[in-house]
Design a protein with these regions (language model features):
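Generic hydrophobic-segment detector
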Residues: 14, 21, 33, 47-48, ...
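Tandem repeat scaffolds
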Residues: 42-267, 271-286
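A composition/secondary-structure signal for short, hydrophobic, low-basic-content segments
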Residues: 2-3, 36, 231, 269
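Bacterial N-terminal signal peptides
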Residues: 22-37
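N-terminal secretory signal peptides that target proteins for export/translocation
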Residues: 1-20
């Protein structure tokens, strides 16, 4: 069940308002289905202005929306789990507290999108464009980020555990306090990226480029960095490693004196800013 509107209302179960809402929703379904089908025509006839008006809520499980043009659309508390949006144009879109678990967004264009507090567990972003996205507190657990462009992305406090990010681009990205544990980042580029307080424990980093990256307070304890590129002793001196850290020849890690970082994500209860996180960050001293 899916609907588009400028306002999302959740009446109490069994109330007259709820009954009217169901009737209204049933009546709008047919017209909205036609609206989605005509998305290409909107893009051709009216440019992006019509798509900008769309706000999506409700459920659209396993929907087929590949190739759609929905720039700057808003997804607020929406459930698009399993949806197929291959190659769709979603640049500048806003995702607040929405569920895209297992969705297929391969080759989609999401550059400049906002992904606050949304769930992209096991989502396929293969070769997608996520450059410049704001993904504070977003959950990418197990996502496929193979050859994905995340240059300049702000992923502060995001969950990237067990992702497949081989050959991905994180150039100039902010990954402050992010969890990258057990992820596959072979041949990925973190050039000039901010990895302050990030956790790389158990990550696969063969051929990964860290040239100019900020590794202050980054957890590299037990991490194998022997095949990583661009590392300097100055970077390693700022990171949190130890005897179990494996480094390229000539580099030596030091043991942390305290915890690395705690990033507490508090989600707003405001309907307008639903899913938009605030952060309290406590950095330990290595």
């Amino acid at each position: 069940m899916l609907f588009a509107s400028q306002r999302i209302v959740s009446p109490l179960p069994g109330s007259p308002a709820n009954l009217l809402s169901r009737i209204s929703l049933a009546l709008c379904m047919a017209s909205f289905a036609a609206t989605l089908a005509a998305t290409h025509a909107w893009a051709a006839d009216d440019g992006e202005d019509t798509a900008r008006l769309l706000s999506f809520g409700g459920m659209c499980l396993n929907c087929e929306l590949s190739g759609r043009k929905l720039p700057e659309a808003k997804f607020i508390g929406a459930n698009f789990a399993g949806a197929s949006m291959v190659g769709s144009d979603l640049h500048g879109a806003a995702f607040f507290g929405s569920n895209f678990n297992g969705a297929d967004l391969a080759k989609a264009d999401l550059h400049g999108a906002t992904l606050f507090g949304s769930d992209f567990t096991n989502t396929d972003f293969t070769e997608a464009n996520l450059s410049g996205v704001r993904g504070h507190g977003a959950n990418f657990f197990g996502a496929n980020l193979t050859r994905t462009n995340l240059d300049g992305a702000n992923l502060l406090g995001s969950e990237l555990e067990r992702v497949n990010a081989r050959d991905a681009q994180f150039v100039g990205a902010t990954l402050f306090g992010a969890n990258l544990t057990q992820g596959h980042f072979e041949r990925a580029s973190f050039k000039a990226a901010n990895l302050v307080g990030a956790n790389l424990a158990g990550a696969s980093l063969a051929g990964t480029d860290f040239t100019g990256a900020n590794l202050a307070h980054t957890n590299i304890a037990g991490v194998d960095l022997t095949e990583a590129r661009g590392l300097t002793q100055a970077q390693i001196d700022q990171a949190c490693g130890g005897p179990s850290t494996r480094l390229p020849a000539g580099l030596v890690a030091r043991t942390c004196k305290a915890g690395i970082s705690n990033v507490i994500i508090l989600h707003s209860t405001s309907p307008i800013h639903a899913g938009a996180p605030r952060f309290i960050v406590d950095l330990g001293v290595p």
